[in-house]
């Protein structure tokens, strides 16, 4: 299955970082590896909640939070939706590649 958000950026390093902005998240789509972990950075004035599989993060305004599990510990390869709820409801697509 291919992501719908368009071009997916390759994620480098230990973390796949999702930036929650007042308008749209950045990036909209990321290719992630099994050993990487999710990090959510909240660039808004309100607390946001992020949900992906078994991972739920609550992130205060202008703060960040990191999942304790690597993607491969709770997701199967494929395209997954990181749901973000705050001032707006939005999502980031994460493409877990094996």
Regions found by a protein language model. Give the residues of each.
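Short, surface-exposed beta-strand/strand-loop-strand elements in extracellular ectodomains
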Residues: 47-56
């Amino acid at each position: 299955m291919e992501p719908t958000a368009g071009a997916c950026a390759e994620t480098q390093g230990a973390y796949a970082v999702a930036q929650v902005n007042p308008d749209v998240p950045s990036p909209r789509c990321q290719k992630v590896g099994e050993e990487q972990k999710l990090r959510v950075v909240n660039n808004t004035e309100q607390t946001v909640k992020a949900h992906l599989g078994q991972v739920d993060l609550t992130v205060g305004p202008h703060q960040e939070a990191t999942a304790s599990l690597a993607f491969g510990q709770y997701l199967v390869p494929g395209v997954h939706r990181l749901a973000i709820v705050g001032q707006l409801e939005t999502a980031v697509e994460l493409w877990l590649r094996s």
